Amino acid sequence: MNQLDNLKKFSKISADTGDVDLIRTYQIQHATTNPSLILKSPLFTTYLKLFNDAIDYAQKIGGNQNTKITNASDRLIVNIGSEILANISGYISTEIDAQLSFNTDLTIKKAHKLITMYQKKNIDTSRVLIKIAATWEGIQAAEELEKSGIKCNLTLVFSFAQARACAERNIYLISPFIGRIYDWYNQRNLIKTSYINDDPGIQSIKKIYHYYKTYGYNTIIMGASFRRLEQILALSGCDYLTISPHFLKQLYQNTNSVTRQLFPPKTIISHHIPVLDQSEFFQEHNKNQMAVEKLNEGIQQFSIDQQKLHKLLLNNLNVQLQK
């Protein structure tokens, strides 16, 4: 048995890719997408029909240039999400435009629009997770969406304050970014040993895991953003792990055994902990320089890739108009 199948015994695996062929190859149950991954996906081969449909859809709906770009982008991510769902048994995480990360109302509006678009394609939307950056505004939006039956994946989690606020508001799933935490400390020469348990990213997710399981929170933890295979193996037993094609291939080709590393406590503590309010959230989150920098950087990176996707769609909208 390969290492990937061994890992599946202890953690549910999500493919961190928009490439449905790779998802089929590794028989993955869940998948995550974002603008960066969509740009890397086979848009002009496997997904050419889906891409062209998004352009046609935007032209049919009409409106000004910005409206067409937005509609084409939304249609494309729903098209790709629907295609992936046809090849997996679990969830697809569909990301909200990162440029909305600090606007609760617009995030809620966009989420409902995407869910409606999935419904019109006869997709079971209980299998769609709306992916939102874990800003304070994003967490508030997700809380409202969860109340209306829309499951959310709060991404770009770097601080314990983010994780705690999500759990307290019954968010379905969070994605702590292990690799980006590691990067921040490693670039500053703040990691003293190569021992995996001294990895700040591993320490962060273990703290969240222990807290959630100790106090009986139902929010799922999905480890994301890995830099080394050792990081993935060190989190065997985490609820979910979303893994890039590079590491999926390594795990698939490796036959070494996998030992479970994370275990829930035998007893759950029934103890009322006051919910973090806005001022307490920012006070705790802002104590963590890494988390503040990495959250803002992540939003900026996703926003840049969203703009690249918009530019690609605009170019094709203009080409179609010239025909």
From Swiss-Prot:
UniProt catalytic activity: D-sedoheptulose 7-phosphate + D-glyceraldehyde 3-phosphate = D-erythrose 4-phosphate + beta-D-fructose 6-phosphate
> What does the record give as the active site?
K131
Got any disulfides in this one, which pairs? Answer: none
Name one cellular component (GO) term: cytosol
Localization terms from the record: Cytoplasm
The record ties this protein, via PROSITE patterns, to: TRANSALDOLASE_1, TRANSALDOLASE_2
Q: Which InterPro entries match?
A: Aldolase_TIM, TAL/FSA, Transaldolase_1, Transaldolase_AS
Q: What is its EC number?
A: 2.2.1.2
Its BP terms in the Gene Ontology are: carbohydrate metabolic process; pentose-phosphate shunt
CDD domains listed in its UniProt record: Transaldolase_TalAB (cd00957)
Q: How does it assemble?
A: Homodimer.
Say which species the protein is native to.
Blochmanniella floridana
Against HAMAP family, the record matches this protein to:
Transaldolase_1
Q: What molecular functions are annotated in GO for this chain?
A: transaldolase activity
The entry assigns this protein to a family as follows: Belongs to the transaldolase family. Type 1 subfamily.
Supply the NCBIfam families for this chain. Answer: PRK12346.1 (NF009001), talAB (TIGR00874)
- State the function annotated in the UniProt record: Transaldolase is important for the balance of metabolites in the pentose-phosphate pathway.
**Which protein, by its recorded name, is this?**
Transaldolase
Q: In which pathway does it act?
A: Carbohydrate degradation; pentose phosphate pathway; D-glyceraldehyde 3-phosphate and beta-D-fructose 6-phosphate from D-ribose 5-phosphate and D-xylulose 5-phosphate (non-oxidative stage): step 2/3
